[in-house]
């Protein structure tokens, strides 16, 4: 049974043919309706945020459906319009409203000889908001007002494009057309208690609570309802949950991507009025641990020397050496957690465990070095405490020091950062049998290429080679304000290539350690190739200075390229035996 859901009402075929015709007319003849800002990934996994295109006069969309005759018939005319209007401030794309598989959409685009991005609406919430209901239809979207300003057949699009290019309003914003219907799966009865609150509790409330790192709490229906317009916006633009990666590449325990069903539930509930059902409020009854430590009271707490941070100015990186006070014997480390004293000024740290009689090395600060040595987690925005895999750990020798490189930013208010690091050990009689290894695919000043001024998509590449059979565990990207995206790919000895992770919308504020759900076996000689793009354009709202040629540098207005990879060697005997010597 076909159903159509729009706003707070639903029409069914069973309700009468006349009502259905009326409803379809309402949808088809609406334009200049505010959709809102949004972002989607295309058939190649690239991220497109509509707000980024606000220097354009409009964005043109052609509704693409695999195997649709209407799409195929419209492509040639659409491409001809692109060749004419692309230089006049019109961006051309397609949109797949059915959320069809990326591989099939990519193949369909190749078959049609399409060279424009095809945005894939997995959850169908964007297409629904735009009012898309027919394949092969053309739309014009204003990236400043976030409105649909034209919809109709491609044959009628030319007139609208001429008007928009000339700075005029579209005289005929809606032109009726026929075509294959686009249908949507709708949840007609969404419960706050049973459907919405559990999603928020699982994905949002840990940060959005009293004392959490988020700026407001989502601890009741009233709070959620009050913030619901903002929640809809950040879901549609993929700003939240933070740190999202491409869900179509790899399988990660912390990809921070809501499922299609979860997105549909939240946005559908908000668009239905954010109503509450039942007497209870699950969010109001959530409880949180009384301790700030993730795994109970640590076995050892390292006090980082307090740092006085002025209100303004540029601060050099601060390097300190901190003893593991109270460590009276060698211990195997199971977990660690860095708690910032003032997270408004501490941006990140680099850590290195320095054993007695040794000197710190660059590799040890960059996640490499001796795999037998203990790993003490650094502070990274949004990062979780580090817990080793079962039966895995490194040795922290008595008398060791912790080298810390601290990066602070000023906020206009003087403050003191007094951070703490919690460390948890294995029992003395339990020696973990496996070690974690790692290496950074990094670009340093000697091989860095300066980013040209105003370049919106400047790419650089670095690689590392894993010399023995190994199981990949996790990946960490690091760039600065101009970082746009970063991709890790495995180039195998047999010549095949596999994408491992796609951080499609890199955000300097969220640099996470993305953990594979299952370790991935790669053979000896596998090359991990990391490709990163930088956006040095004026459209990058975080860009300090688009006119500048950007060098490598430690400060945020310069740039870096770190692609950290962690793995375990399949043969652990050499590593373990070297520890025993």
Where are the model-predicted features located?
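Aromatic- and Gly/Pro-enriched helix-to-coil junctions and flexible linker segments
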Residues: 174-327, 331, 339, 348, ...
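Thiol/selenol-based redox catalytic cores and closely related redox-interacting motifs
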Residues: 121-183
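Structural microenvironment flanking redox-active thiols in thiol-disulfide oxidoreductases
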Residues: 70-112, 119-129
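Bacterial N-terminal signal peptides
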Residues: 14-26
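A short beta-strand-turn-helix
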Residues: 38-59, 189-195
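Short active-site neighborhood of thiol/selenol oxidoreductases, capturing the structured segment around
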Residues: 53-72
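Structural micro-motif
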Residues: 36, 58, 114-117, 132-139, ...
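Beta-strand-centric surfaces of beta-sandwich/beta-rich domains
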Residues: 242, 247-252, 282-332, 337-471, ...
């Amino acid at each position: 049974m076909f159903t159509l859901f729009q706003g707070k009402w639903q029409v069914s075929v069973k309700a009468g043919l006349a009502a259905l015709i009326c409803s379809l007319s309402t949808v088809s003849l609406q334009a200049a309706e505010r959709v809102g800002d949004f972002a989607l990934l295309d058939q190649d996994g690239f991220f497109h945020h509509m707000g980024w295109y606000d220097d354009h006069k409009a964005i043109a969309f052609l509704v693409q459906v695999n195997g649709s005759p209407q799409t195929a018939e419209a492509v040639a005319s659409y491409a001809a319009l692109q060749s004419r209007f692309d230089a006049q401030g019109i961006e051309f794309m397609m949109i797949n409203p059915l959320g069809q598989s990326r591989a099939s959409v990519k193949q369909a685009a190749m078959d049609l000889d399409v060279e424009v991005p095809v945005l894939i609406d997995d959850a169908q919430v964007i297409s629904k908001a735009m009012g898309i209901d027919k394949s092969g239809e053309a739309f014009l979207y204003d990236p400043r007002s976030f409105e649909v300003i034209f919809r109709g057949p491609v044959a009628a699009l030319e007139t609208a494009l001429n008007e928009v290019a000339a700075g005029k309003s579209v005289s005929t914003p809606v032109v009726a057309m026929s075509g294959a219907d686009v249908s949507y799966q709708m949840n007609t009865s969404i419960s706050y208690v049973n459907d919405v609150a559990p999603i928020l509790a699982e994905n949002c409330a840990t940060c959005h609570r009293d004392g959490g790192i988020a700026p407001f709490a989502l601890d009741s229906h009233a709070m959620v309802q009050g913030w619901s317009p903002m929640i809809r916006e950040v879901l549609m633009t993929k700003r939240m949950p933070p740190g999202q990666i491409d869900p179509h590449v790899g399988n990660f325990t912390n990809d921070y991507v809501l499922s299609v069903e979860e997105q549909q539930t939240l946005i559908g509930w908000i668009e239905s009025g954010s109503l509450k059902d039942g007497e209870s409020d699950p969010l109001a009854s959530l409880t949180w641990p009384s301790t700030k430590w993730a795994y109970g009271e640590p076995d050892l707490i390292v006090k980082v020397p307090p740092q006085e941070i002025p209100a303004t100015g540029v601060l050099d990186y601060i390097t300190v050496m901190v003893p593991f006070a109270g460590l009276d014997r060698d211990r195997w480390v199971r977990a660690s957690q860095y708690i910032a004293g003032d997270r408004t000024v501490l941006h990140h740290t680099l850590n290195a465990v320095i054993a007695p009689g040794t000197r710190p090395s660059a590799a040890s600060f960059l996640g490499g070095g001796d795999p037998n040595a203990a790993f003490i987690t650094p502070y990274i925005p949004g990062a979780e405490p580090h817990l080793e895999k079962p039966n895995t750990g490194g040795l922290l020798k008595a008398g060791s020091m912790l080298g810390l490189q601290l990066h602070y930013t000023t906020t206009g208010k003087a403050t003191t950062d007094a951070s703490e690091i919690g460390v948890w050990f294995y029992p003395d009689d339990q020696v973990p049998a496996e070690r974690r290894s790692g290496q950074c695919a990094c670009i340093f000043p000697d091989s860095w290429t300066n980013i040209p001024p105003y370049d919106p998509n400047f790419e650089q590449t670095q690689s590392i080679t894993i010399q023995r059979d190994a199981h990949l565990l996790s990946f960490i990207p690091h760039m600065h304000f101009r970082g746009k995206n970063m991709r890790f790919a495995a180039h195998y000895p047999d010549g095949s290539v596999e994408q491992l992770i796609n951080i499609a919308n890199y955000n300097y504020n969220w640099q996470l350690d993305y953990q594979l759900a299952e370790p991935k076996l790669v053979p000896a000689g596998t090359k991990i190739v990391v490709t990163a793009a930088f956006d040095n354009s004026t459209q990058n709202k975080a860009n300090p200075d688009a006119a500048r040629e950007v060098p490598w540098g430690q400060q945020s207005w310069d740039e870096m390229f770190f692609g950290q990879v962690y793995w375990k060697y399949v043969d652990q005997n050499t590593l373990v035996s070297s520890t025993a010597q």
